[in-house]
Amino acid sequence: MKALIILGFLFLSVAVQGKVFERCELARTLKKLGLDGYKGVSLANWLCLTKWESSYNTKATNYNPSSESTDYGIFQINSKWWCNDGKTPNAVDGCHVSCSELMENDIAKAVACAKHIVSEQGITAWVAWKSHCRDHDVSSYVQGCTL
């Protein structure tokens, strides 16, 4: 019985943690999903962005008290403007997606929303990109990856 309880907690912790991508695995996935060069943004810039936003973690969340909103998933997409979490006041839901879908291990919906955001606002919509990637050599983010 104890073994079943421990096993249950183990599965629960894996489900809560989500998927943390390895850098090159994420590079290949983002390329496959069409982000390399999308709206002029290089794959290396997307990798830099996701490193600083979520450390490549699909389940990352960050609550923003000032706007009463939360950033979700590998791209840290905000519930005030882009997704619906059912609790953010006056949310816009610009991507027409549930915020929980942005935290799935299959990141296709998160990528689709990121494409929508970059199409409307550019890569500068992400504060982490402006702080850590803009005007930096980001080539190391894809260095050594077989793409």
From Swiss-Prot:
Q: Which InterPro entries does this chain map to?
A: Glyco_hydro_22, Glyco_hydro_22_CS, Glyco_hydro_22_lys, Lysozyme-like_dom_sf
Keywords, A to Z, come to: Antimicrobial, Bacteriolytic enzyme, Digestion, Disulfide bond, Glycosidase, Hydrolase, Signal
PROSITE patterns under this entry?
GLYCOSYL_HYDROL_F22_1, GLYCOSYL_HYDROL_F22_2
Top EC category: hydrolase
**What top-level branch of life does the organism fall under?**
Eukaryota
The protein's Enzyme Commission number: 3.2.1.17
One annotated GO molecular function is: lysozyme activity
Entry annotated with the keyword Lipid biosynthesis: no
Keyword Hydrolase recorded: yes
Q: What does this protein do?
A: Lysozymes have primarily a bacteriolytic function; those in tissues and body fluids are associated with the monocyte-macrophage system and enhance the activity of immunoagents.
- Summarize the subunit comment: Monomer.
Q: Which family does it belong to?
A: Belongs to the glycosyl hydrolase 22 family.
Q: In its UniProt entry, what is this protein called?
A: Lysozyme C-3
Q: Gene behind this chain?
A: LYZ3
